[in-house]
A protein has these predicted regions:
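Acidic, low-complexity intrinsically disordered segments
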Residues: 2-224
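Radical SAM enzyme core and accessory elements
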Residues: 2-5, 16-17, 40-44, 58-67, ...
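Flexible glycine/acidic-rich beta-alpha junction loops that bind and position SAM and/or redox cofactors
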Residues: 10-14, 107, 194, 241, ...
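Structural recognition of alpha->loop->beta junctions
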Residues: 110-129, 275-286, 343-356
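Short, electropositive alpha-helical surface patch
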Residues: 56-57, 64-66, 247-250, 336-352, ...
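Structural detector of well-ordered beta-strand residues that form the stable sheet scaffold
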Residues: 96-98, 120, 260, 287, ...
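Hydrophobic positions in alpha-helices of CheY-like receiver
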Residues: 35, 84-92, 250, 278, ...
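Radical SAM [4Fe-4S] cluster-binding motif and immediate context
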Residues: 167-328, 332, 341-344
Length: 454
């Protein structure tokens, strides 16, 4: 039985970070590696990453003639996946189709379609393997759907084989994150121990948090050829004890890697010693949800941090020469003066990289229902739910002006001459040209929004 695991390209309307980063489809690699031994010789599995694949989707279907196709994606891919499943059914009438990924696990009903046979809303690896076994046993679609719907609740343990990175060997040199290239992914924990009101990640595990055994993580790290490693935990910087074990094992095994991680500002502010030790074993950059400089916003988001904590965090990372990728949420009550104050604050702290996200109450989060009446876009306009489009009506300026202020803030923070020279010195001219080209494409998407006014 021939099986294709497909990551689709984003919609052209989606304001895409794929212009400055393309990461490996780790979830599909896990599916590939965890096919049960008793059926492994009965299935031919290929991962097709259409973000970097040169063939057109229709040509892939004609050449491969799959029996089963499984798609992965975010909310922005829902419409695309529906259309791709319809195309597959028309070209290959016998093919079975499925959809998975983080959005399917939280809002599975979005994938309801006559062209999608199976939706994996929990325990994707087990559900995928169950589907394979039943398809090999000639079960019909309704029988498989019934079996999937009666599957156990979401698991809070992780005992799977390491991802099959060889399944994307033809694409690996194309995977990068900003200046981290080529870059591999690893996940050491699942869920988040905090409960920020805007966060989609915690909904995936229904608010639960669990971590892998650190020895197993280190064994996986040793098998990864890339030097640049992006640890994609929702919050890697959480437990001092666990991080100490990570530091000790990295040192004992003499692992030479460069790490990019997610971390909270309060942990960094309170644990400068641990951050320094992580720097010594390869920590290069941290993505930090600064979220806001306004106290009221931080309380509304249930962030449990303060402006002062954020400032201390930034200063610690700067002192240790650890790159900061700061993310901030821009509320819709922002005024022109608020944009100016935020820009000045970021510039005064010498923040070099920032991701400014208009407040986006994603379907599936606890804040979504509170904002339904204020939506500018349809719930079903999936491609614009990218945390870059303005989906709520700004209170004190036009949509066009809001986009203009966003773009202006980006340029005022990022495109400072002293930052550009420092980045060239640190990463080289070629890497900076690549980033400039990618960021210019994102800027053009914003410019089109400004011209159109929506």
């Amino acid at each position: 039985m021939k099986v294709l695991l497909i990551r689709p390209q984003p919609h052209r309307e989606t304001i895409g970070l794929q212009h400055v980063m393309i990461c490996e489809p780790l979830e599909l690699e896990y599916l590939s590696s965890n096919v049960p031994d008793e059926i492994r010789n009965s299935v031919d599995i290929k991962i097709i990453d259409l973000i970097v694949e040169k063939k057109k989707y229709e040509d892939v279907l004609r050449d491969e003639q799959p029996d089963f196709i499984l798609f992965t994606g975010y909310i922005t891919h829902v419409g695309i996946i529906r259309d791709m499943c319809e195309t597959a059914k028309k070209l290959i009438p016998h093919v079975k189709t499925g959809a998975g990924g983080v959005h399917a696990e939280v809002v599975s009903t979005d994938f309801k379609s006559e062209f999608i046979d199976f939706v994996y809303d929990r325990n994707g690896i087990e559900g995928f393997n169950l589907t394979l076994k039943m398809l090999l046993g000639n079960s019909d679609i309704s029988e498989i759907q019934a079996a999937l719907s009666s599957a156990p609740d979401k698991s809070t343990s992780f005992s799977f084989r390491h991802p099959d990175r060889s399944a994307v060997s033809k694409y690996r040199e194309k995977y990068y994150y900003m200046f981290h290239s080529p870059c591999a992914l690893i996940k050491t924990s699942f869920g988040c121990p905090y409960n920020c009101s805007f966060c989609f990640c915690r909904e995936i595990t229904e608010g639960r948090y669990f971590a892998r055994d650190m020895e197993d993580v280190i064994n996986e790290l040793k098998s990864i050829p890339e030097e640049e490693i992006y640890i994609v935990d929702d919050d890697f910087l959480f437990s001092r004890e666990r991080l100490r074990k990570f530091i000790d094992l990295i040192s004992e095994e003499n692992i030479k890697k460069k790490f990019l991680v997610y971390g909270r500002a309060d942990f960094i502010a309170e644990n400068a010693d641990i951050i320094a030790q992580l720097k010594a074993v390869g920590l290069q950059a941290v993505i930090v949800g600064i979220e806001s400089v306004r106290t009221l916003d931080l309380k509304l988001y249930n962030k449990r941090t303060t402006r002062e904590i954020n400032e201390k965090c930034i200063k610690i990372l700067k002192a240790l020469d650890i790159e900061l990728y700061a993310t901030l949420i821009i509320p819709l009550d922002f005024t022109v003066n608020d944009f100016r104050e935020l820009t000045a604050w970021l510039r005064n702290l010498n923040v070099r990289f920032v991701n400014l996200q208009p407040l986006t109450p994603l379907p599936g989060t606890e804040i979504f229902d509170s904002y339904v009446s204020r939506l500018l876009v349809k719930r079903e306009d999936y491609e614009v739910w990218d945390m870059a489009h303005v989906v709520l009506k700004p209170e004190f300026m036009s949509i066009r002006r809001f986009y203009r202020e966003l773009l202006r803030a980006y340029y005022k923070v990022i495109m400072r001459p002293k930052h550009i020279f420092a980045l060239i010195k640190k990463y080289g001219i070629c890497a900076n040209i690549k980033m400039l080209a990618g960021s210019s494409l994102v800027s053009m998407q914003y410019m089109r929004k400004i011209v159109r006014g929506h």
